[in-house]
């Protein structure tokens, strides 16, 4: 089983990279986000690898971080999500943005990924809502927001507020943190307009 490869980029294709490791070229399929962050041919690169072995095929998937690889695995635990859809989601959202979307039950953000329809997006946010917080690191903002939501806070206004703040140029982590603070400081039970207003107040501090 291959877990990690360190070598020199030989070529970058539309959905894969060929990594030369001591004269052997390994083809690793990657998300568009990962491919965009790799260097050019001739430059060094390190990829965390997920190996798929089938009867007539051995396929490698490459990731810039172990965290991205874990999300790739987790996404495929959802019914109807295979490697192609998982890579499409990771091409559209960072691990942190994906965690935020799941915490907020924000199926709209996930359905932006190519090949991900509304039904699959709903399954992703529903089936992973109790699994995503098990991860840490850059997903901490979404976990904090999920804790602020609790059981009695409607997710739709919160998702709308986070979306509106990101449309204003803030990152999803900044928006999630601001909305979490807004909920904590009196915004619980409010509509999206109130949460946006309170969120902007938090961001201006």
From Swiss-Prot:
Its main location: cytoplasm. It is found in: Cytoplasm. Residues 144-153 are annotated as: Flexible linker. One of its GO terms (biological process) is DNA repair. GO terms for cellular component: cytoplasm; Holliday junction helicase complex; Holliday junction resolvase complex. GO terms for molecular function: ATP binding; four-way junction DNA binding; four-way junction helicase activity. Residues 153-205 are annotated as: Domain III. It holds the Pfam family RuvA_C. The RuvA-RuvB-RuvC complex processes Holliday junction (HJ) DNA during genetic recombination and DNA repair, while the RuvA-RuvB complex plays an important role in the rescue of blocked DNA replication forks via replication fork reversal (RFR). RuvA specifically binds to HJ cruciform DNA, conferring on it an open structure. The RuvB hexamer acts as an ATP-dependent pump, pulling dsDNA into and through the RuvAB complex. HJ branch migration allows RuvC to scan DNA until it finds its consensus sequence, where it cleaves and resolves the cruciform DNA. This is Holliday junction branch migration complex subunit RuvA. It comes from Rhizobium meliloti (strain 1021) (Ensifer meliloti).
